[in-house]
Amino acid sequence: SWRLEKGEHGKPFYQDAPWLHFSISHSGTFWVCAVSGQPLGVDLQERRRKGKAAAKNESDNLGRIAARFFHPAEAQYFSSMTQDGSRAWETAFYDIWAAKESYVKYSGEGIGKTFGEFSVSDGKGLCFEVNPSFGPPAMLRFLELEPGYSLCVCAERIEEVRVFDLGLP
């Protein structure tokens, strides 16, 4: 049997299988697990759709969260998405959040590391590489799981991502 341990910041690993790396996330009705021979992180976020009347309030609430936790470039990108009257701001917010969470899971820093210390956006869109001053560089891969969800995998290098739907009840 393999013993599950936790790293300094809570990242789980198998003591008896140091070559096996995994990351898990769940949101809404989905659960995801990423497995690799290299360190990685995965995060899933359900975008919580509300009616049109609540959309402005929701945009304002997410804007306050972005101002507090996002890097200035990410906050700029999010803000630019709120200007056109569409709901692009919703996808932008949750894509940024999923990317940031997947990075801190990959790096092993956990969410205790201030999200504002690194950016997954250049201010105009999302980036596919992260180069923070405090941790290892990484690649990001955004995946389509289901409409209404943001899913991001992060690792030092990403050559291929295979998705298996286990279809469990």
Positions of predicted regions on the chain:
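Core catalytic alpha/beta fold that binds nucleotide/phospho-ligands
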Residues: 1-169
